[in-house]
Amino acid sequence: MPDKVPYFDLPAQIRSVRKDLDAVIAKTLDNTSFCLGPDTAQFEKDFAKYCGAEHCAGFNSGTSALHVALMLLNVGRGDEVISTPHTFVATSWAISYVGAKPVYV
């Protein structure tokens, strides 16, 4: 089979938006607004609109997002959360952070 379709070709995916990405990254690094700040607020507003949602909250990591999601669902001590063992460890961390027990299936 001489012609294989690449499983993952990040350079091809980025090529069409590279100049825009470089400009936004440079602006963000120059004004150090990569945590909170006006760019984050604008992203949250735009993404909420795009999703048809009233609100959007950006997080610094998937761990933080999972942790807050579990808190908002009132998951806590004594609860069990069904998860998969085939995931990043942050999934289990977030469950443990709220005092719940991960149950792997």
Q: What are the language-model segments listed below?
A:
Residues 71-105:
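PLP-dependent aminotransferase-like
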Residues 1-72, 76-77, 97-98:
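Conserved PLP-binding active-site segment in aminotransferase class I/II-type PLP enzymes
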